[in-house]
């Protein structure tokens, strides 16, 4: 593969911003073609680091999906508003570029008129920058400590010692939990750092930031796990094509069950493609990880889950704490059963070294190993 060009990635992002900043015009689709061409080329390049290649490939497809939404499917300047801001198409070019940059960056829609009604923890508009700084520093330190503790497990000989699908149940659960904890807290560290930079620079306000992951106690169904507890960084770009397909192409009534299930299956299909592209970069094989199967079956199980819950409501069963507890057990059991092939291939491709920090506060305080030896892939 040819070497990766970060300049072309930056160019792709700039073109996406410009496509949202220019006033509505029929020729905007040309920018979409250029963005898709750039991203397709970059997907066939490599940095030499499999973990970085995986992340870059995923983000390239996210940019492509976002460009499809904002250029082809949505009249962004007329349909999307930030905090009731109106008339952006009449604003100056500089103001439209600022607006478009914030739109492209706002993957979760916080503060926009398309924000999902699921975010329960957010900063008050009255929160000072100093208070935000202190709270986010504590939050970031907590996330780092959890990653550090998971690193201790990743460095042990029992961690990820064999393919995940063939592991004894207890070690399979331990490996999945380690991956889940490390991944969620690592992503949270990155978003916390980004929030600090933007708020302290005056680019954004404390109220523009919410935790990247929802409450785990809300994940008592598979649907709620994906829709509330898991990150929502790709929610819009995965759902917009399905909404267009269901209402504009198939002519289904918005909000009807047929339309919603078309959107559900389309979103998980695109999620499968997104992750399969990353897996291909690592394994050079579209099928080894079973990525498409894993993500597409999530839609199937959610529809079955909806049916069971519908029957329960018809029987007069009320939602109580013990039913939620049973739901949590069901959700955990489902992922322990369904994710070993995909997750195992992902971990083996990236190596367990990707879940071992290069520096460790815990080991440093415990035995002076501030920079422990590198873990073998």
Curated annotation (Swiss-Prot):
Membrane-protein topology: Multi-pass membrane protein
Gene Ontology molecular-function annotations: O-acyltransferase activity
Keywords: Acyltransferase, Membrane, Signal, Transferase, Transmembrane, Transmembrane helix
Chief site of localization: membrane
Metabolic or biological pathway: Secondary metabolite biosynthesis; terpenoid biosynthesis
Transmembrane residue ranges: 29-49, 56-76, 176-196, 258-278
Pfam families: MBOAT_2 (PF13813)
One GO biological process term: terpenoid biosynthetic process
Cellular component terms per the entry's GO annotation: membrane
Enzyme Commission code: 2.3.1.-
Signal sequence annotation: 1-27
InterPro entries, per the entry: Wax_synthase, Wax_synthase_dom
Location of this chain's protein in the cell: Membrane
Functional summary from the UniProt entry: Acetyltransferase; part of the gene cluster that mediates the biosynthesis of pleuromutilin, a tricyclic diterpene showing antibacterial properties. The geranylgeranyl diphosphate (GGPP) synthase ple4 catalyzes the first step in pleuromutilin biosynthesis. GGPP is then substrate of the premutilin synthase (PS) ple3 to yield premutilin. Premutilin synthase is a bifunctional enzyme composed of the fusion of a class II diterpene cyclase (DTC) and a class I diterpene synthase (DTS), with the corresponding domains and active sites containing characteristic aspartate-rich motifs.
PANTHER family: LONG-CHAIN-ALCOHOL O-FATTY-ACYLTRANSFERASE 3-RELATED, OS04G0481900 PROTEIN
Family listed: Belongs to the wax synthase family.
Official protein name in the record: Acetyltransferase ple2
Organism, scientific name: Rhodocybe pseudopiperita (Clitopilus pseudopiperitus)
């Amino acid at each position: 593969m040819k070497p990766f060009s970060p300049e072309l990635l930056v160019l792709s992002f700039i073109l996406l911003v410009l496509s949202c900043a220019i006033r509505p015009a029929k020729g905007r689709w040309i920018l979409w073609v250029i963005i898709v061409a750039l991203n397709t080329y970059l997907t066939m390049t490599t940095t030499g680091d499999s973990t970085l290649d995986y992340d870059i490939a995923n983000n390239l497809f996210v940019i492509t999906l976002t460009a499809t939404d904002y250029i082809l499917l949505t009249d962004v300047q007329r349909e999307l508003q930030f905090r009731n801001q109106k008339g952006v198409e009449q604003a100056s070019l500089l103001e439209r570029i600022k607006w478009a940059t914030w739109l492209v960056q706002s993957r979760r829609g916080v503060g926009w008129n398309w924000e999902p009604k699921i975010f329960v923890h957010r900063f008050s508009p009255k929160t000072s920058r100093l208070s935000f700084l202190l709270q986010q520093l504590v939050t970031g330190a907590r996330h780092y400590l959890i990653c550090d503790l998971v690193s201790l497990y990743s460095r042990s000989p029992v961690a990820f010692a064999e393919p995940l699908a063939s592991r004894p149940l207890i070690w399979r659960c331990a490996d999945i939990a380690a991956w889940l904890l490390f991944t969620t807290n690592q992503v949270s560290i990155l978003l916390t750092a980004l929030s600090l930079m933007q708020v302290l620079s005056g680019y954004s306000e404390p109220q523009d930031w919410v935790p990247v992951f929802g409450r785990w106690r809300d994940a008592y169904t598979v649907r709620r796990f994906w829709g509330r507890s898991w990150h929502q960084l790709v929610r819009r770009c995965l759902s917009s094509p399905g909404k267009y397909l269901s209402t504009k192409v198939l002519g289904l009534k918005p909000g009807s069950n047929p339309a919603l299930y078309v959107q559900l299956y389309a979103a998980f299909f695109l999620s499968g493609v997104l992750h399969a592209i990353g897996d291909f970069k690592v394994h050079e094989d579209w099928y080894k990880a079973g990525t498409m199967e894993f993500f597409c079956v999530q839609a199937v199980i959610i529809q079955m889950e909806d049916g069971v819950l519908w029957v329960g409501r018809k029987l007069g069963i009320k939602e109580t704490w013990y039913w939620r507890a049973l739901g949590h057990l069901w959700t955990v059991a489902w992922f322990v059963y369904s994710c070993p092939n995909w997750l195992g291939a992902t971990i083996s491709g990236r190596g367990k070294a990707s879940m071992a920090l290069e520096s460790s506060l815990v080991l440093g305080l415990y035995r002076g190993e501030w920079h422990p030896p590198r873990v073998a892939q």
